[in-house]
């Protein structure tokens, strides 16, 4: 599992060693990286993702024994566990997570605890189908896979940040939890979202970037095929226009940049929600090479 610390400062002029990271976030604390990740604060964090909730609890002891035998000292837990932590909207179940964190910690294996937002429970999709992203044809992406949610959905963000705060309140001071794992494999299934939420957010993003519609028209070359716009309210996202049509390359490039920014903003929102409660532990995440 490869991790990184966000917002590290390349030209840090302080006397701190190079692996010490600072952040502009007032709720963050400086920390040494990656020493704090391990249980004893020494050595290299060695391990991977661990999904104990996908197995019968009676095999956990054997899991831990084999981890120790392999030299594992850190595992990421609960990446896909939102439905186990919050099986219903008004019901929370931390019992199983308490037990596995305690079992790992007592064995000297540190926990990089996930925000568990990589995939949402089905009850959330059933109640709020509008949180699903849409493909370029206007079809909602079906629930049941990773990242089946729109990063621009205010409804989804509200539920996700509530989960983050609940986890931080319960485990922020737990000595066995040495880091936070935000999201998972960003951009895997929702980097390109063509929903109305995304459209509205893209218009605001374009206005912030270009300032005037004249600047945007010039950058996108919108005189071609009569695409000139009179205001940012006319900006479109590159939805499907027909098999023989081509998307404006400037529009497409900015939509790619916009998608990246929306995922980064979502990461920061989760991070900050936890940092308000637990400011003294590092934050990590991971990526798929293809995204």
Summary of predicted features, one role per range:
Residues 2-10, 16-76, 87, 102-106, ...:
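N-terminal carbohydrate-binding accessory modules
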Residues 41-45, 77-81, 147, 248-252:
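A short alpha-helix capping/helix-coil boundary motif
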Residues 50-51, 86-88, 151, 257-258:
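Short, contiguous strand/loop micro-motifs
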Residues 51-53, 78-81, 114-123, 178-187, ...:
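Short, solvent-exposed turn/loop segments enriched in Gly/Ser/Thr/Pro and often Arg
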Residues 61-68, 73-141, 164-168, 270-277:
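Aromatic-lined substrate-binding rim segments of carbohydrate-active enzymes
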Residues 138-291:
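Polysaccharide-binding and catalytic clefts of secreted carbohydrate-active enzymes
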């Amino acid at each position: 599992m490869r991790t990184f610390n966000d917002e590290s400062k390349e030209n840090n002029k302080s006397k701190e060693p190079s692996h010490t990271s600072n952040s502009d976030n007032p709720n963050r604390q400086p920390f040494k990286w990656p020493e704090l990740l391990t249980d004893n604060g020494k050595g290299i964090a060695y391990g991977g993702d661990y999904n104990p909730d996908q197995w019968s609890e009676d095999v956990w002891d054997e899991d831990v024994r084999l981890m120790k035998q392999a030299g594992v000292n850190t595992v990421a837990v609960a990446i896909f566990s939102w439905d186990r932590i919050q099986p219903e909207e008004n019901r929370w179940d931390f019992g199983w997570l308490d037990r596995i964190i305690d079992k790992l910690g007592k064995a000297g294996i540190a926990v990089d605890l996930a925000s568990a937002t990589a995939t949402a429970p089905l009850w959330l999709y059933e109640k709020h189908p509008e949180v699903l992203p849409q493909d370029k044809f206007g079809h909602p992406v079906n629930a049941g896979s990773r990242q089946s949610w729109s990063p621009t959905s205010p409804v989804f963000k509200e539920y996700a940040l509530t989960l983050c705060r609940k986890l931080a309140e319960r485990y922020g001071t737990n000595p066995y939890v040495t880091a936070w794992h935000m999201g998972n494999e960003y951009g895997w299934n929702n980097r390109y979202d063509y929903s109305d939420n995304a459209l509205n957010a893209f218009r605001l993003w374009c206005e912030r970037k270009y300032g005037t519609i004249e600047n945007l028209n010039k950058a996108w070359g919108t005189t071609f095929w009569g695409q000139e716009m009179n205001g940012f309210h006319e900006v479109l996202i590159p939805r499907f226009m027909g098999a023989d049509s081509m998307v404006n390359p400037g529009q497409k490039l900015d939509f790619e940049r916009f998608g990246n920014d929306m995922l980064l903003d979502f990461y920061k929102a989760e991070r900050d929600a936890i940092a308000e409660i637990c400011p003294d532990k590092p934050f990590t995440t991971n990526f798929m090479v293809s995204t």
